[in-house]
Amino acid sequence: MAKVYNQEVYVQFLKQHGFVFQSSEIYNGLNNSWDFGPLGAVLKQQIKQALYNFFIKNKADVLLVETPIILSELVWKASGHLANFVDTLVDCKSCKYRFRVDQINAEIKAKKDWNSFKVNCPNCHNQNWSEVRDFNLLFQTEIGVVNNDKRLVFLRPETAQGSFINFKNILQAKKRNLPFAIAQFGKSFRNEITPGNFLFRTREFEQFEIEWFCKPDDANSLFEKQLIMVEQFLQTVLKINPELLKKHEYDQSELAHYAKKTTDFLFNFPHGLKELWGLANRGDFDLKQHQEFSKKSMSFFDSELNQHFLPFIIEPAVGIERLFYALIVSSYRREIINEEEREVLSLPFDLCPEQIIVLPLVNKLKKEAFSVFETLAKTRWRVCFETTGSIGKRYRKADAIGIKYAVTFDFESLEDNAVTIRDRDTLVQQRIAIKELPQWFMKNGQ
């Protein structure tokens, strides 16, 4: 079984190597807010690029859009978020901790159920509770500078609604037949009662959501097709360890207000088996709601059937930070080599923030080694150069941050115009002529 370490191991590892830092750390930090450092920002960008390449690039039926973070209050009335996007919470009067009710007891589904259970506070073990109440997760703000001209608006909790309200615009502009999809990357915001577990649940996060519009009769087959696509991406592109993944289909009683069917890919995070990527059949709920509230038709005309109807929507949705965290957990390991422990981040070659490192064996060879670096830097790979520390320590650091190949320029290189390439995962070393390096990486970069 794949090894999963406790959360603090990943937090400290990612901070030490420049992937993720506590936000506002010099001011004692902002609770559950994280900055992506030099390596983390590149890795996050590579994950997004991989998503784009797999799900969008060169796909005639998938269209990319970008919509604003701030949307009209009416959008969220129509979507049901103002009424339904709530968590039920309760406060412990003894220790002042606040909890989501379902975190205390998963059997409690609503406020009316609370009094049926006698539960102790998970923190102080008392039974001294406040009244149970609903808490809306939307962040709200105002636009306008004059008091009587101010309007209430909300920061989006998902990118999906921006895609839905542009359905007819895109249909008219691109003339697509069903099924077709609108895809979107973007920041979303949720005023979570209990954010936590590192990158798993934060108030500000980035999403990738695809909205597939289809005929109602095609919804089930499209759902299954997207399920296969998501699984292929996780296992063949990100190379997530399948031992850490599990599919879970929700009962009807567990579904969100808009959903007809939902299946999640769960991942074994340090805090347990939790949602990584969700796939929902949203039916025609969203288009029907926006049609009703906007008084604008959201129907699709099928010329073959000679009729108008509201398409069903199949939605794969994932948080980029959760993918990032899952990739780290799946890729990171500690092992003993020659009685020494090394940390290894076995990222897929295409995702490595730094793919190749060029190392002079000693500083005397720095100039010649840098010439090799300059040659490789002109290629499409992400290449770095390092001279600090012994060659062994530089190998260990390269392994820890996920660099797949180390290219070492040694004294023999002055004679044979060749270098030693070391593989991060196998530790196999081989001698390659400097002039053949671009071709070698083109063939073996994987």
Swiss-Prot record:
Presence of the UniProt keyword S-adenosyl-L-methionine in the record: no
GO BP terms in the entry: glycyl-tRNA aminoacylation
GO cellular component term, pick one: cytoplasm
Top-level class of the enzyme under EC nomenclature: ligase
CDD domains in alphabetical order: GlyRS-like_core (cd00774)
Localization: Cytoplasm
Amino-acid positions noted as binding substrate in the UniProt annotation, renumbered to this chain: R100, E158, F205, E206, Q207, F208, E209, E315, P316, A317, V318, G319
Example GO molecular function: glycine-tRNA ligase activity
Recorded catalytic activity of this chain's protein: tRNA(Gly) + glycine + ATP = glycyl-tRNA(Gly) + AMP + diphosphate
PROSITE patterns: AA_TRNA_LIGASE_II
Predominant cellular place of this UniProt entry's protein: cytoplasm
Residue numbers binding ATP: 190-192, 200-205, 275-276, 319-322
Taxonomic superkingdom: Bacteria
EC number annotated for this UniProt entry: 6.1.1.14
Record keywords, A-Z: Aminoacyl-tRNA synthetase, ATP-binding, Cytoplasm, Ligase, Nucleotide-binding, Protein biosynthesis
Subunit: Homodimer.
HAMAP family in the cross-refs: Gly_tRNA_synth_B
UniProt-listed NCBIfam families: glyS_dimeric, PRK04173.1
Function per UniProt: Catalyzes the attachment of glycine to tRNA(Gly).
Family, as annotated: Belongs to the class-II aminoacyl-tRNA synthetase family.
Name used for this protein in its record: Glycine--tRNA ligase
Organism encoding this protein: Mycoplasma genitalium (strain ATCC 33530 / DSM 19775 / NCTC 10195 / G37) (Mycoplasmoides genitalium)
Encoding gene, per UniProt annotation: glyQS
